[in-house]
Amino acid sequence: GKFTETRHITVEVYNRYNDGGSDPTSSVYAQYIKQGMLDKYNVDVELVSVGRWTEVDDLNNLLATGDAPDVCVTYSYPTIQTFAGMDGIIDLNPLLTEYKDLLPDLWALLGDYNIYYDQDPETGSVWAIEAVLAESARINTFIRKDWLDKLGLKLPTTEEEFHNCLIAFRDNAELLLGADAAKMVPFSISTDIGWRADLLNVSKVPEDVSDETLYVYGYDDRHLLYPNYKEGIRVLNQWYNEGLIWKDFALYTDASVEDDMMKSGFVGAFIHNWDYPYRNGEDSIQANLTRANGADAGFIAVDCFQNDAGITRKYLADRID
């Protein structure tokens, strides 16, 4: 139904502060939501901007000053538990039970699995509802297709072939980069090794690993405790000592320096989010590469890492987000 008197609620929305991005509280999507809620339910929605990368601190400050939005979003469940212990948020379980019949779209989208994912098994309390993980593609391996073509190499399909490509990039730095040969980075990585080398590392997990083992250690989306995982780290150490990995990766905790190297055309390959070279439109890695190095320059996704059964396994996250 529609309220006879206009109601007002505040709702958190992430601000990623992307260069050239729109204000998340007044974007076209924000206007669509606000106008739709007002027209259909007579609810005035006020969006509150919270920094995506500073969300925990921002929410703590808003809660401390009494200005926290009515509806908050966070990836930090410990923060939710802290708020619950301070009586800063309400138990949703009674409301979910009472109003379930009025929320068919919510149940159709999330189902009991997501809605009750965080339910306290002892008290029955529900302090947060898990969103749907709409995109599960996760991570891909990317390599400079134009460099492969220039060196007469095929797209790598195995770890050995990928390794050989990195060696070729290193050994032909002057041909590929000319005066910038000293800036050659055959394979780039960050301090988040568990994410940025995941496909290589989990390829060392035996095919006969039990479902029990995957469940027990599956809480960690970096898979650090999966069986044989350390063998992937051994490979990375070998590559580093061979001069194939960005030697200064451990000095930087944000992505800007590494992204700039990719945009400038100094990086031959990397593992990252499934669409990483192509996101951010005209400021994407791919767009910058083609502008600086010609239409043929750019990265292409490849699958190179098979397990002991010759199968490419990608251990994806649960359907919560």
Where are these regions (language model features)?
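Extracytoplasmic/secretory soluble proteins
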Residues: 1-321
